[in-house]
């Protein structure tokens, strides 16, 4: 009977730890989500006030205002035909006329999903993507924001490194 009580207490303690980790990570996730939304809206405003050429230059800048979190978080710019116009870490994405049919390692056509979200004005998308500066692919949550009255949208996201750890 004592062993059974110890097992129950251990299980309760483990459950408590899991709840604590989830509780403590919620503000970090909220901050990360909020940062992505804020940066996308700032980029949209930059496009509207400074023009598309200046925005492409600034968004492509690895050390610019639209790259943060040690370079892991960044804004990218696309048009409604799924053509990448600016990306600070993957200039090779600028070459194709469209990325509409490109997929992640799991076969998800996430660029197509980006366009659908942009058609609605905004939205979140989840897919697998390489982490900048690392040789790993992790789940990424990206906020898509259509720049009002244009054929452009921007995106910014964060990676889920492991349960409760967002980057």
Task: Give the residues covered by each predicted segment.
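N-terminal membrane-sensor/transducer module of prokaryotic signaling receptors
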Residues: 2-9, 17, 29-167
């Amino acid at each position: 009977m004592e062993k059974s009580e110890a097992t129950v207490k251990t299980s309760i303690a483990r459950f408590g730890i899991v709840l604590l980790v989830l509780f403590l990570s919620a503000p970090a996730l909220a901050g990360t989500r909020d940062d992505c939304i804020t940066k996308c809206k700032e980029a949209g405003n930059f496009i509207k006030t400074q023009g598309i050429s200046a925005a492409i230059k600034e968004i492509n800048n690895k050390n610019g205002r639209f790259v943060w979190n040690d370079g892991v978080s960044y804004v990218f710019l696309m048009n409604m035909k799924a053509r990448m116009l600016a990306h600070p870490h993957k200039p090779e994405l600028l070459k194709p006329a469209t990325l509409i049919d490109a997929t992640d390692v799991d076969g998800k056509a996430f660029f197509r999903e980006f366009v659908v979200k942009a058609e609605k004005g905004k939205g979140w998308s989840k897919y697998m993507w390489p982490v900048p500066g690392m040789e790993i692919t992790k789940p990424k949550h990206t906020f898509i924001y259509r720049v009002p009255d244009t054929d452009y949208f921007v995106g910014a996201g964060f990676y889920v490194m492991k349960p409760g750890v967002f980057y």
